[in-house]
């Protein structure tokens, strides 16, 4: 596909949602030939992401802080804190669905309206839920985490506490979005969901888990380089990183 030319669009600049005093601009895959599973997978290798069926990549005039990251699944080694996360959450029941269920919406709404009141998706709406998470470009998996019934201080019946929206590509899985019940925030279900996606990637013999954009200067977007080894998309190349820096090593303990 690299020898073919495609039509791309570019947005106007607008205030960045992640870095104050920065202006954001997006490159959009508008060519109809890119609106299929094979092309979407190729776009992911070029640093793109998706929102609904729209594939995009940051193309900001004065900033290149957003850098796509993918974990090398076969070589992944969990840190001590990631091992603790797996142990702490080992009682949960994991299920999978291939469909975006309407029954997920109350959980999504609670997550957005409780934990992300400062975000661009607040307040949550069902239309936003559908348009953002559904996708016709590729196969999807919805990884469900359930709290089992009859535990001490637990629910009276199995309770859905987290959904990890995941795209299936020819060379990996892509972590699109994860939302969870605010009462379970202390469980670190975001980390646990990534670990579950990594395990599933390994089971499916897929070499990569795409985690989205790492933004070092943004606290809520700088966690994605804690899963080693990973590759980071910089200046059109995937550059491998196998060891944490001193600061990251301290965070991972």
UniProtKB/Swiss-Prot annotation:
Subcellular location: Cytoplasm
Catalytic activity: N-terminal L-glutamyl-[protein] + L-leucyl-tRNA(Leu) = N-terminal L-leucyl-L-glutamyl-[protein] + tRNA(Leu) + H(+); N-terminal L-aspartyl-[protein] + L-leucyl-tRNA(Leu) = N-terminal L-leucyl-L-aspartyl-[protein] + tRNA(Leu) + H(+)
Alphabetical GO biological process terms: ubiquitin-dependent protein catabolic process via the N-end rule pathway
EC number: 2.3.2.29
Transmembrane segments: none
Keywords recorded for this protein, A-Z: Acyltransferase, Cytoplasm, Transferase
Main location: cytoplasm
Record flagged with keyword Ion transport: no
Organism superkingdom: Bacteria
GO cellular component: cytoplasm
UniProt cross-references to NCBIfam families, sorted A to Z: PRK01305.1-3, PRK01305.2-2, PRK01305.2-3
Functional description taken from the UniProt entry: Functions in the N-end rule pathway of protein degradation where it conjugates Leu from its aminoacyl-tRNA to the N-termini of proteins containing an N-terminal aspartate or glutamate.
Family under the similarity heading: Belongs to the R-transferase family. Bpt subfamily.
Stored HAMAP family: Bpt (MF_00689)
Protein name: Aspartate/glutamate leucyltransferase
Organism: Colwellia psychrerythraea (strain 34H / ATCC BAA-681) (Vibrio psychroerythus)
Higher taxonomy: Bacteria, Pseudomonadati, Pseudomonadota, Gammaproteobacteria, Alteromonadales
Gene: bpt
């Amino acid at each position: 596909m690299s020898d073919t030319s495609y039509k791309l669009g570019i947005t106007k600049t607008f205030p960045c949602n992640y870095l104050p005093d920065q202006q954001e601009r997006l490159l959009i895959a508008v060519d109809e030939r890119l609106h299929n599973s094979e092309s979407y997978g190729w776009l992911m290798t070029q640093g793109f992401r998706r929102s609904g069926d729209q594939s995009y990549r940051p193309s900001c005039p004065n900033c290149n802080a957003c850098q796509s990251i993918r974990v090398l699944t076969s070589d992944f080694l969990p840190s001590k804190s990631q091992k603790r996360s797996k142990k702490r959450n080992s009682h949960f029941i994991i299920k999978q669905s291939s469909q975006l269920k309407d029954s997920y919406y109350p959980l999504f709404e609670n997550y957005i309206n409780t934990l992300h009141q400062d975000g661009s998706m607040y307040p949550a709406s069902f239309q936003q839920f559908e348009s953002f998470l559904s996708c016709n470009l590729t196969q999807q998996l919805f990884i469900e985490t359930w709290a089992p019934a009859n535990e001490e201080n637990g629910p009276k019946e199995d309770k859905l506490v987290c959904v990890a929206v995941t795209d299936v590509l020819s060379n990996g899985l892509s972590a699109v979005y994860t939302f969870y019940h605010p009462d379970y925030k202390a469980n670190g279900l975001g980390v646990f969901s990534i670990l579950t996606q990594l395990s599933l990637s390994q089971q499916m013999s897929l070499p990569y888990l795409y985690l989205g954009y790492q933004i070092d200067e943004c606290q809520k977007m700088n966690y994605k380089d804690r899963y080693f080894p990973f590759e980071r998309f910089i200046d059109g190349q995937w550059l491998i990183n196998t060891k944490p820096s001193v600061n990251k090593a301290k965070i991972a303990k």
